[in-house]
């Protein structure tokens, strides 16, 4: 029964993908070990090569045993196993989030090296329930409360074929097949809110919402018919757009697991049928992204979309232009949206970007601030710089590296640069944008700025493309 459900899920999620190989993330816990055995059956049946990936976060002594165990299972199944290591650098602040990002960076980079398009992960039904509860407590909007069984990370398709399978079924499968797994001791700690929620739901108790913050924020002016009720978005009637704090607590303050799953499905359906199509339309109609790594937002077209989608659009652009993997918080985006409604020109910094209003357009370009992007040596044929640009060398260029243009370098080569095309495209913000572009240097000399076709010698030939490490559950950048 379990395999049939898994097979139906994975075939539906993969759809028309023509795959000869696929990767799977396995930690040693019951969820991922069960996924490994299920995926192995499916891969054999469909003649697909399966690559097993484990990441050691170097935080628990047991993790080495887990990795060794997964390697042994992989060998017994005749599957290639890759063991990766996350370096936490003895920095334990916000460790869970950094470890998650580091894990996905490592795994997806390996997938790119192996020319694999899909990575399977073991997120199951209980994980989705816990995520919904946590996001509800953070006052997430409807996009935040929704869940997805497919998303993108580093241009790799992340697929979750266990999304509607409870953990109990996975454990039962392992026990019935006499398969061993490891329990992470940190999962029983009350230190993390997720664990508290998990333990309550596991006992069949109702989830009781922890109200750590005010439930509602001030709504934006206008757009009342489809307002987000300040982005809590758990209401069932989208047309009213208003609800009292008391009614929301009554509705979501106490919920059974079944009620949470039901609410999650309703939220997902609304996203899929209403907001996701609107988001895609908004990007197509109102957004222009240029190879120089900046973007324009048409504010006249932007104005017609719902507030939920407006927040997503701003975050979409901030992530792409900054090269960061995480979205800005709502409270950071809210002032920008309010400024837009005031119909006056402004210039702000947010999330590693400059946001500048020019008449009826919003220009967004990179801002380094105090943290300059790391220089990259061009040892291989290509390199990713600032998480945004891919630079490729088409000839031998020893001792060259990619960095940004300093004011000192700019003054030296200024008269040799043709900035007219960039000037026209950026509404005369060419100098600011120029300083955010990748340049190639040998020692202290600038030998190339590929974006503006500057080369100090005809022998050089470099290609550059705007390829941000974009992460989204709702849309994809390529």
From Swiss-Prot:
One GO molecular function term?
Answer: tRNA(Ile)-lysidine synthase activity
State its location(s).
Cytoplasm
Q: Which reaction does it catalyse?
A: cytidine(34) in tRNA(Ile2) + L-lysine + ATP = lysidine(34) in tRNA(Ile2) + AMP + diphosphate + H(+)
Q: What is its EC number?
A: 6.3.4.19
Matching entries from InterPro entries are given as: Rossmann-like_a/b/a_fold, RPE1, TilS/TtcA_N, tRNA_Ile_lys_synt, tRNA_Ile_lys_synt_N
Per the UniProt record, one Pfam family is ATP_bind_3
Task: Note the superkingdom of the native organism.
Answer: Bacteria
Instruction: Keywords in alphabetical order, please.
Output: ATP-binding, Cytoplasm, Ligase, Nucleotide-binding, tRNA processing
Q: Which GO terms describe its biological process?
A: tRNA modification
One GO cellular component assignment for this chain's record is: cytoplasm
Q: Which family does it belong to?
A: Belongs to the tRNA(Ile)-lysidine synthase family.
Matching entries from NCBIfam families are given as:
lysidine_TilS_N (TIGR02432), RPE1 (TIGR01045)
Q: Which PANTHER family match?
A: TRNA(ILE)-LYSIDINE SYNTHASE-RELATED
Q: HAMAP family from the xrefs?
A: tRNA_Ile_lys_synt (MF_01161)
**Stated role:** Ligates lysine onto the cytidine present at position 34 of the AUA codon-specific tRNA(Ile) that contains the anticodon CAU, in an ATP-dependent manner. Cytidine is converted to lysidine, thus changing the amino acid specificity of the tRNA from methionine to isoleucine.
Q: What is this protein called?
A: tRNA(Ile)-lysidine synthase
Q: Which organism is it from?
A: Rickettsia rickettsii (strain Sheila Smith)
